[in-house]
UniProtKB/Swiss-Prot annotation:
Organism of this sequence: Cronobacter sakazakii (strain ATCC BAA-894) (Enterobacter sakazakii)
Enzyme class: hydrolase
Low complexity bias spans: 405-414
InterPro entries: DEAD/DEAH_box_helicase_dom (IPR011545), DEAD_box_RNA_helicase (IPR050079), Helicase_ATP-bd (IPR014001), Helicase_C-like (IPR001650), P-loop_NTPase (IPR027417), RNA-helicase_DEAD-box_CS (IPR000629), RNA_helicase_ATP-dep_RhlB (IPR023554), RNA_helicase_DEAD_Q_motif (IPR014014)
Binding site for ATP: A53, Q54, T55, G56, T57, G58, K59, T60
Motif (DEAD box): 165-168
Alphabetized NCBIfam families for the sequence: PRK04837.1 (NF003419)
Name of the encoding gene: rhlB
Name this protein carries in UniProt: ATP-dependent RNA helicase RhlB
Family, as annotated: Belongs to the DEAD box helicase family. RhlB subfamily.
Main location per the UniProt record: cytoplasm
Gene Ontology process terms (BP): RNA catabolic process
């Protein structure tokens, strides 16, 4: 994490449980990010927090630190049953739930607090086996949480801490009824610590906070700035016929260390993946059709640097902290203005600079005015020479083979091809 992204406030300055501070410092966390410095004084005082912060600002560690401190500082109910977790952390996607669980593991190891994970797709019996042994903090997606609760594998009657992460995304994915169902089975809001985090504190998110929290305090990090000032934005107007060649040319010119390419449909993502894999790039595909285990493996490979490019639908645009993404390509301009902000928010994180390149083609250029109105500025336009685009590119690979993840490794030697003109 860049030092420019940190405040002068140290975790050790707060009255945090000493074991929590030691665990944080062991992981190299000494100074707070802005959202942590704003949220911790409130949660340590037992006050509910609704925070506006993008992914990558340290919000996960803000609510994890608060949760572990609270559980260590407040005894569990004497009559608590083995199927009753003490804290519940709800996430909109299984990838985010897995990531939060991973971030919580060092704190759990240091404190002896037990973690559980519940998400759909696979691993039902494996997850259930952990729950049956008893967990203190349960992290999961709403569908699987409801499933376990209805079967009495989980009872929410002893919940002391609740976290709702990416609340706006919960609405986008239609999970709000599930959230309310789960809240109705918990103790009253006044009897627990409640935290909500969202990229935007829209009216509907504030309404949820009013309904389910106890006079929540609102904290915001740079609320006036919808796109990071460290992100260089750039816009091209390609024809539909030249769009793919322009993308491949830009990748050759930029040669990004780590890039994410977003498209609006899974079929478009598969097409992009096929062209880039055939062209020799180390590229992974992340859509809803990719099996859960493979999605997690691809994310891990991309995070480790074994893949240079990830092609994704908006399933990956929210909540996933992938460090050091240098470039984001919007192959399609998104239909939802907020998705533009969330997509380009993959880069320029934690004090680093980033580059966002958008292609406004004939099909999606109509989305541009609403996006620019939403972000409050025009995206700088760049021009390209059609005669300078790459040509003689290989035909795209197809997804007939099981391996969805990677194309061939990049070679340091240039391929024998030429630009036209």
């Amino acid at each position: 994490m860049s030092k420019t992204h940190l405040t002068e406030q140290k975790f050790s300055d707060f009255a945090l449980h000493p074991v929590v501070v030691q665990a944080l410092e062991k992981k190299g966390f000494y100074n707070c990010t802005p959202i942590q410095a704003l949220a911790l004084p409130l949660t340590l005082a037992g006050r509910d927090v609704a925070g506006q912060a993008q992914t990558g600002t340290g919000k996960t560690m803000a609510f994890l630190t608060s949760t572990f401190h609270y559980l260590l500082s407040h005894p569990a109910a004497e009559n608590r049953q083995v199927n009753q977790p003490r804290a519940l952390i709800m996430a909109p996607t299984r990838e985010l739930a897995v990531q939060i669980h991973s971030d919580a593991e060092p704190l759990a190891e240091a404190t002896g607090i037990k973690l559980g994970l519940a998400y759909g797709g696979d691993g039902y019996d494996k997850q259930l086996k952990v729950l049956e042994s008893g967990v203190d903090i349960l992290i999961g997606t709403t569908g699987r949480l409801i499933d376990y609760t209805k079967q009495n594998h989980v009872n929410l009657g002893a919940i002391q801490v609740v976290v709702l992460d990416e609340a706006d995304r919960m609405y986008d994915l239609g999970f709000i009824k599930d959230i309310r169902w789960l809240f109705r089975r918990m103790p009253a809001a006044t009897e627990r610590l409640n935290m909500l985090f969202s990229a935007t504190l829209s009216y509907r998110v504030r309404e949820l906070a009013f309904e389910q929290m106890n006079n929540a305090e609102y904290v915001e990090v740079e609320p006036e700035q919808k796109t990071g000032h460290r992100i260089k934005e750039e816009l091209f107007y390609p024809s539909n016929e030249e769009k793919m060649r322009l993308l491949q040319t830009l990748i050759e010119e930029e040669w990004p260390d780590r890039a994410i390419i977003f498209a609006n449909t899974k079929h478009r993502c598969e097409d992009i993946w096929g062209h880039l894999a055939a062209d020799g790039h180390r590229v992974g595909l992340l859509t809803g059709d990719v099996a859960q285990k493979k999605r997690l493996r691809i994310l891990d490979e991309f995070t480790r640097g074994d893949l240079d490019i990830l092609v994704a639908t908006d399933v990956a645009a929210r909540g996933l902290h992938i460090p050091a993404v240098t470039h984001v390509f919007n192959y399609d301009l998104p239909d939802d203005c907020e998705d533009y902000v969330h997509r380009i928010g993959r880069t320029g994180r934690a004090g680093a600079s980033g580059h966002s390149i958008s292609l406004a083609c004939e099909e999606y250029a109509l989305n541009l005015p609403a996006i620019e109105t939403y972000i409050g500025h025009s995206i700088p336009v760049s021009k390209y020479n059609p005669d300078a685009l790459l040509s003689e590119l290989p035909p795209p690979k197809r997804l007939s083979r099981p391996r969805t993840g990677n194309g061939p490794r990049r070679s340091g030697a240039p391929r024998n091809r030429r630009r036209t003109g």
